[in-house]
Amino acid sequence: MNLLSLKEKLLDFGKPIGLQVDEETSKALTLHAGIVAKKYFPKSIYLRIVIFSSGTLHMFFTFYEIESTYDNLFLINDFNAESPWFKAYIAHINDKDFLELHYSAMGLLEDQEILTSISYMLNSLIEEETLKYLNPILNNE
């Protein structure tokens, strides 16, 4: 996989959400963006995408602060049991707790496979089935 050509395609693809390069090496490319989807989420979401030249893709969606309570942990477990794509967890960042969703895929050796996966996951984030289990965690009911 040629990360340089992929980078240009990703930046063009990601213009609507302000996707920017965070870091690049010969083996990996990291991009990030702040996503605003007020129709679905009251606050912006931080998106980080990491692509390895081996064909592995990771997407991290970091939401706003949440409390690390038993109720939220049970809701996160429900989400994880129902979500075929994302895995949710509480990420401890700078002494604060945030809800984070993670998606990963391996064996994506063509640029188009990466672009299709990213597009699909961005759309999956706002699908009714995802929101059904995500909104209670975020108190967006």
Model segments located where?
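Generic alpha-helical secondary structure
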Residues: L3-K7, T69, L115
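Charge-rich, low-complexity N-terminal segments
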Residues: M1-S44
